Amino acid sequence: MASPPSSGQPRPPPPPPPPARLLLPLLLSLLLWLAPGAWGWTRGAPRPPPSSPPLSIMGLMPLTKEVAKGSIGRGVLPAVELAIEQIRNESLLRPYFLDLRLYDTECDNAKGLKAFYDAIKYGPNHLMVFGGVCPSVTSIIAESLQGWNLVQLSFAATTPVLADKKKYPYFFRTVPSDNAVNPAILKLLKHFRWRRVGTLTQDVQRFSEVRNDLTGVLYGEDIEISDTESFSNDPCTSVKKLKGNDVRIILGQFDQNMAAKVFCCAFEESMFGSKYQWIIPGWYEPAWWEQVHVEANSSRCLRRSLLAAMEGYIGVDFEPLSSKQIKTISGKTPQQFEREYNSKRSGVGPSKFHGYAYDGIWVIAKTLQRAMETLHASSRHQRIQDFNYTDHTLGKIILNAMNETNFFGVTGQVVFRNGERMGTIKFTQFQDSREVKVGEYNAVADTLEIINDTIRFQGSEPPKDKTIILEQLRKISLPLYSILSALTILGMIMASAFLFFNIKNRNQKLIKMSSPYMNNLIILGGMLSYASIFLFGLDGSFVSEKTFETLCTVRTWILTVGYTTAFGAMFAKTWRVHAIFKNVKMKKKIIKDQKLLVIVGGMLLIDLCILICWQAVDPLRRTVERYSMEPDPAGRDISIRPLLEHCENTHMTIWLGIVYAYKGLLMLFGCFLAWETRNVSIPALNDSKYIGMSVYNVGIMCIIGAAVSFLTRDQPNVQFCIVALVIIFCSTITLCLVFVPKLITLRTNPDAATQNRRFQFTQNQKKEDSKTSTSVTSVNQASTSRLEGLQSENHRLRMKITELDKDLEEVTMQLQDTPEKTTYIKQNHYQELNDILSLGNFTESTDGGKAILKNHLDQNPQLQWNTTEPSRTCKDPIEDINSPEHIQRRLSLQLPILHHAYLPSIGGVDASCVSPCVSPTASPRHRHVPPSFRVMVSGL
């Protein structure tokens, strides 16, 4: 409803009939109450003197009760009246006065546009336009102002679209736009160090524009918008997505009806409490949560659930009235103005825009005052009341004067920047079912003030802007590393003890026969394997990243070389035994330790080739594996993301496959040798049983260890414990199986290993070996074992010699009584000596030699020289040689020969070295002894 036109309007209507004349005073009174400014004064104000020319201002706003926003227009009128009254009292525009003419737009585009054109056509020349509440009506009128050279000042239009100065160059507003809250939000985010946010926007242009502007503001300040969600009717899906993206700080743009739905969804998703912070518009109606209707899709959201989800949210809105106790341009404080406003509105509902309307009237007055000063200073001699809609110059003067506005009003400092009010933004927080002001932002000074002890978070501190992910390196426990290192040191001490034992007793028969040099290599391999445990336990908690990467290569090399050294030496020993005892043709074969070292070196060379190629082509690198987040055991608002260091490369599977294949073939070869030599019954020489046990244990443990280690790669303590125990077990069991039996044997029964030297083979092997028992293999270990057998035979034969000496003395005494037997005994004696010497052939096969000796004695019982039965000899043929001189001559020749003839064949010395007599070796009877036998014995 437009205000009545002033005296400059067209001809008045015809006089009403007499009954209507009675109603005219009542009608005029009503019009004066509805639009007092149209007549140039406010209610209760004295009429200005007739000589005071008016400065007309067009007032456009909704006033009817049928329109929802009509309450805004009606609510600000008392404040407008106060401002006009105070301006007149101060004679700010003397000799002029403000003449505000109100026109009802009814928040309708057509009606609002008609009211504007009616004011232009039928009203006086208006200097400015005051008003603009509904965005649609305001934008239409503001877009056409430039053509009329009119400047518009709004007190309630907050839509961001009106900030476009290219489209609305003559539009100003005393109320901050909806976008004005974005710098305040930015300041709040910086204050609490929130660097990561998410947005939730209702699909309405007003909210979308604010969201878009906020995005630009935050982007320029390097604040991450991790997720942007929008919704039309059901916000639950968007809320769920925000939670899935770990958004803790939510910037919402929606109306109060949707706000209830949003918080119900937040309650269902548990997006409230100490971990979350909601920041939403603060311009909702007071106690809006009591007015909204919760939809059926949130049936479980009861009132207490809604209030629980709302607890702690922060609302952002412009400050309707300054809280500072400072006198304004009117000479009164904002608080004094508020009291006067409340007393003047007398039953009219309050409006949150009343302060901006009050300051707006003062802005118009100050602008016109400045324009008059500009006109007075110019040489045009133009009066301000001479303005018309085609006066572009005066329109520009008024426009420039508006831009220069700067004073302190009841809403704070009134300053325009590109037509936008640089006002004050307040922050309120929902606490215990009520909104409490907790701070304000001054846009002019760009400062944020948080009221002490008013803002309250549900936790002990402000929520984090995201789940704090504490990247925690999973490291090996120091106590575990210490325990396993202690076990490793004990293993190395044991290996050192075995090494000392092996070196000290290297000349002992038992140790010498078991290849002490190869034993040293076995110990060295075990110690290298032990040493790798220390390196496997060093991770990022002990060494730097660069050192760890170096350790990746070093520990791989040490473990690989240690394994090959230990088992390579063990298998080389077994191969020599296999080569000796599987030599079917029994050809002479010499396998020295140097050759075994070459074999072990060849195995190591293969290892080095693989490792060098691995390092050159695809070296091991330090990689960090990130696992899924875990809750903090201490219950803090953080999540722990375990990190684990690994030694990996691009083609890790291929390289491991090559190494495993090579080591597997080596173990299979060892198993084959151990199986082939299983029947060699020389404990000092044959370790096949222990090698088999070692291979079995090592193989099983390695397979189990590798599988469990792979399955526990995300648990470094378990993985290290398994790897270390497998290495300790394999190394310890291998060293113990090789050396403990020797140690026990050497300490308890040193000769046990050299007794019972019968070579036991399979039945087929026995038949073949019996046919080729005359061959000789001059290999050190075989020779050593045979030497032991010969020494045992030597001892037995020495005892036999002693018995023969006694028998010889008895025979000699008897021969002194029976000289005729001398010749026969002499012949028999030489025959017996020849038979005994021929037993040197038994050295080719000890078992065979023993058998020959036994058979020979059984078949020639006379060789036993039993003197108690002289009747078994032929008496008659020898009676002629038993004369005393024959006996004396025979004994002088036979005794040295009888005593020394056995010695060369049993390891003794040549008779020529101890007797001036002719050496028995010079006799033809000694020339049949095989040279190989002599070499074998003397060489040993």
Swiss-Prot record:
The modification Phosphothreonine is found at T818. InterPro entries: ANF_lig-bd_rcpt (IPR001828), GBR2_CC (IPR041689), GPCR3_GABA-B (IPR002455), GPCR_3 (IPR000337), GPCR_3_C (IPR017978), GPCR_3_CS (IPR017979), GPCR_3_GABA_rcpt_B2 (IPR002457), Peripla_BP_I (IPR028082). It comes from the Eukaryota. Highly expressed in areas of the brain including thalamic nuclei, the hippocampus, cerebellar Purkinje cells and the medial habenula, and moderately expressed in the cerebral cortex, certain anterioventral thalamic nuclei, dorsal medial hypothalamic nucleus and suprachiasmatic nuclei. Also weakly expressed in the testis. Residues 1-40 form the signal peptide. The keyword DNA-binding does not apply. The chain crosses the membrane at residues 483-503, 522-542, 551-571, 597-617, 654-674, 691-711, 720-740. Disulfide bonds join C107-C134, C236-C265, C264-C301. The modification Phosphoserine is found at S775, S778, S883, S892, S912, S915, S919, S923. Keywords: Cell membrane, Cell projection, Coiled coil, Disulfide bond, G-protein coupled receptor, Glycoprotein, Membrane, Phosphoprotein, Postsynaptic cell membrane, Receptor, Signal, Synapse, Transducer, Transmembrane, Transmembrane helix. Residues 504-521, 572-596, 675-690, 741-940 are cytoplasmic. Belongs to the G-protein coupled receptor 3 family. GABA-B receptor subfamily. This is Gamma-aminobutyric acid type B receptor subunit 2.
